[in-house]
Each structure stands twice: as C-alpha cells, then as structure tokens.
Amino acid sequence: METLQGRKPKKPHYIPRPPGKPFKYQCFQCPFTCNIKSHLFNHMKYNLCKNSISLVSQRMEQTGKASRASQHSPAFSHNSKELPLDAESTKPIENVKIEKAVTKEAREKPQSPIKEVSKDDTEPALEAKDKSEDMDIAQNKISSAFSPVARTCESEALSLSPHKDDQSTIPHFYQQIAPWVTSASSAHLLPPIPEYPPYMVPERSLPPLYAPYPHNQASTPAYQVTPRETQRPLVPSPLIPPNSSLLHPYHYRYGHSIFPSPPLPYSFYQHPELSIPLQRSRYLPLDVYSSRFYPREYGGHLVPLTHPESYSRLAEDRAVQEHNTGDKGIRESPLEGCDASGSPDRPSTADVTQRIPVGLRLASHGESHSGSQSHIISGSTKANDNLPKMPCGQNQEKMLQKTERYDSQTTISSRSSDISDKEEDEETEEEIGPLNLSKRDQATSNNMTHHHYPDRELHYDSESSQEEAPLNLCLRVQSSNQALPNTSETPEKETISNAEVSTTESPQDLEPCDQRQTAAFALCQLASSRDIINDTSVKQQDVTESQNTKCLPSPDNCSVKDSPNILNASMVALGQKRANNRPLRHTNKRAKVKEPSRPRRKRSQNC
C-alpha cells in the first residue's frame, strides 16, 4: 500500500496543493486554483463550492453508500495522492495520538491472550471512531474535482445537517402535531393608537386568524370558509369620532355604523348642489368643431360657418360661393375671388387693399340689382319715377336735379361715339373677338337702355360730380358713399348708357370735367381683360331674351359676374393713364386691343 501511495498519479486537471503546506481557504479542490486567492475567488464568485456541498449531501442521502477506504489506511483517490493527507489533517489531534500509541504497542510488545483481549477491546472503539470519521469524510467527498475539504467544525455541522433535514422534510403546515405550537407566541399586532381598537379584536374563545391552531383543531383546514355567527362585516372606525371628547366612552369590539342610514338606491346619483342636470346631449355642438373648417358644398347646398371671423377672407368667399352655386361652369380662384392672377403663396397688393369694400359691395349690389330688375318687369318709361333705392341712403332730390340737368345736355362727340358703338357691335357680332358687345335686338336694347341704364348712369354721375376733382383710380380703401355706387353695374353698360342717353334726350354738350372722367373710366374698364367683355355680352343676351320671353334672369348669375369685374377693374386701374376723349377708344379698339392689354395687366400686378 505504501507503493501505491508513493507512486505519482497522472497529471490531474487541477493543480493540487503542495503536500506539506496547509490550506488556507474553504474550498481547496477547485479546477482553477492551487493556493492562490485570485484563482480561488473566481470559483467562489459563482457559488460553486456551495453547489458542490449540497450535491454531495443529497447524493449520500439517496445512495447511502459508505466509503471503501480501509480502517487503518485512508482511502486513495485517483485524482491526487494528497487527498489522504487532507483527510488526516482534518482528524482531531487526540485521535491521531491514540492511533500512534496503539500501533507502537502492537508492533513492539509480544502477543499474549491478555493483551489480545485488551487489544480487542480497544479496537472496536477505534473502529467506531474511524467509521464515523470515514462517513463524515465520504459524505463530503466525490470523485469530481468539486469535492470540498472542510474543517473539523464544518464537517461536524455537515454531518449533523442531514439528520436535521430528515426531521423537517414534511412541511409544518401539514403536520398533525406541530412541534412549534407550544413555543409559538400568541402576541397580536398592537394598534398604532392605543385608545382606538383595531378593526377586529378577537375573543379568547375564537382562534386568532394569524396564530397556529391548537392540537385539537389540527385536522381543520387552514382557511375557514363558512363564517361564524359572531363574525360581522368589518367597518373601519372613523379617525375622528363625532363625540366632543377624543376618547370613546366605550370600545367597539366590532366596527358598527354610527349613523344608521337606508341603503343607497342603485340609480344615477344627482348631486343636490348641481342645478344643471348631468344627463346632457350625447353630441357636442357644432361650434366646437366648425371654427377651423372651410365652408364647403355638399350636393349644391352650402354649409355655412358658425365662426367666420377666424379667417379674414371667409366672409367674401362665402358670398361669392353663394352666388356661384347656380352655375358650376364659371369658377374663380377661391382666395382671390376674381381670377388667378395672384401667386398661391403670397397675396397680391390689390387683394389686400380691396378686402373690406368687396364684402360691402357684394351686399349692396344684391339690393341694387334686385331693384333694377323690378324696373324691367314694370316696363315703365319714366326714369324719374323708377329711381332705385340707393344702398347708401342718398336723397332722391339730388337725383331729380341731376336728371333735369342731363336732359338739357348732349354732345356731338357722344353722338359719334354712339354711332361707332353700333358699327363696332355689328362687326364683333360676326366674329368672336375679345370685345364682344353685340346686341341682337336693337329696339329692345334701346328700350331697355331708356328704362334701365339711365338710372345707373345718373347714379354714377351724381357721385362723380359731388367732388369736382380728377378721377381717383387708386386702390385704397374708399368710403362707403364712394365705393358702393361704382359697382352697381358693369362699366360697359355705364359707357353705353352715357352715349345713348346723351343722343336721345338733349342736344347740348357735357361739361369737360364729366366728359374726361367718364371717358377715362370707360377706357380703363374696357381694356381690363377679355373675361369682362365675355361676361357682359352673355349678360346682355340674357337680359334681352328674358324681356322677350318674360322670364327673369337668376340674380345669382348677375351678382357673381359683377364681382370679378369690379376687382379686375380696380386691379388694372393701377397702371392706367387717362385718355382725353372718347374717339381714341374706338380707334384703339378696331386695331385689336389684345396686345396692349397684356403689358397693362402685368404692370398692375407689380404696382
């Protein structure tokens, strides 16, 4: 056996401890270490020592195998030869001294029956001690490298631990007779305030909820399902009692309701202080939503806005769209109202300056146009009796004075302009040109001009003659008395009415100031754009056909067609120059006014 111990084994997978050097650390046999603490810490960091100890104890409990080591010579491990030295180092010093003395006596002294008896008596005691120590070592040993080598105190603790585990394998809750019932304290949780009792103070006859059951009630389940008669619904006591004194006159064992009240009905609770009922309409009003939406058409019906003041242009656009629902063919730009001259990302200057008067002009034009159509239906021939109601509230006395004044005034230049108008209208009726002012029935149109147009012409001249000043063509915001009457009728009709009234009624000349103003204004309006001419020609045809068939034209068409004419006229008038007399207009018109009108429109946008 000494030869086996002296032979060096194969190189193990771990570095063994040197034979004469005592180990310092709890876990020596690690795959990482010899005696260096840094290597050992890597093993102890992952709790491999505790896992190996628990695995050894469980395996020894399951198998119950004892070590095959001999009684005198310790077991030899195939991993290393230093394991017996480790096992011997863990033995108590007293046992080592006794073993040495016994071996010396057996070798030196001769054999005798008396000595043999004494030796036989001592050997069972030694064998019992060796077996107990071998069992302790074998429980901690395993063939793997993770078998720990513990100290004497730890080996004793480990040897006692499986016996304790055997006793406590059954849970305490399922034991019929629990060993800790008598030693357990039945102290209850104290309330935070000693004056006030807790929610339920149990009686001595009742078992407490959190104390262990006595021996006679061990068979009962842990949780009692059926409530007892003495148990009542737990109501917490109020923090501040209604009594004047802070202390109760007597303690409540159970929390009773101090103020008995009937049970609350299961219905909708109506607070007495609320005057407004809580049950309201399920839908919010449209005012909440419509402040940010743009007015739109749904099937020909316009949905108005409830808060139009949130946008600056909504009032004008809505008025334009109300007139525009009748004819879907004519479409203007929604932000400009007249044409798409302005760029989409920035407004034009004409649009900014004319913002306020446009909405007023549209409203006033509706009244004046309705008044003018009533004159067409009546068919009366007196211009003085059929004066329309002016939107600005002008006196009719001034109008009568103006009519008397213009009955005695005509000019030769106006006659020539009227003749040239008729010749040009006959030419433009055959070819579709930019300036189409054709009248199919001259008789009906002449009658119409006697009935309808003089009122408009007198209205315009009355306004222009109040201030004996040159014509103001700027786009600044004008007063309502000056801005509104200009839009009562299209400028083409005004110029035609000026010419026709002057030829039929009086043979005298106009004043030079009035002649210059009317000529310049008519020239500016005629040269504005092609759309104005087309709209006016269509409108005149509608008026003549309606008088023949006694059908009224829709007010929507007229009002919508007038609104872009006004804005176009005001925009083009920025860069215009006044002409001196009427015949210049006809010479330019016969030479195709298309080319000079284009740079004028561009100049008006830049102003």
From Swiss-Prot:
Spans of biased composition, class Basic residues? 579-592
Provide the binding site for Zn(2+): 27, 30, 43, 49
Report biased composition (Basic and acidic residues) as residue ranges. Answer: 79-133, 318-334, 452-462
Cellular localisation: Nucleus
UniProt lists compositionally biased (Low complexity) regions at 369-380
Q: Which GO terms describe its molecular function?
A: DNA-binding transcription activator activity, RNA polymerase II-specific; promoter-specific chromatin binding; RNA polymerase II cis-regulatory region sequence-specific DNA binding; zinc ion binding
Keywords attached to this Swiss-Prot or TrEMBL record, sorted alphabetically, are: Activator, Differentiation, Metal-binding, Nucleus, Transcription, Transcription regulation, Zinc, Zinc-finger
Stretches of Acidic residues bias are at 421-432
According to the record, the residues making up region (Disordered) are 60-133, 318-467, 482-511, 575-607
Q: Its GO biological process terms?
A: cell differentiation; epidermis development; positive regulation of transcription by RNA polymerase II
Q: Quick one: signal sequence residues?
A: none
Q: What does this protein do?
A: Transcription factor involved in epidermis differentiation.
Protein name from the UniProt record: Zinc finger protein 750
Species whose genome carries this gene: Danio rerio
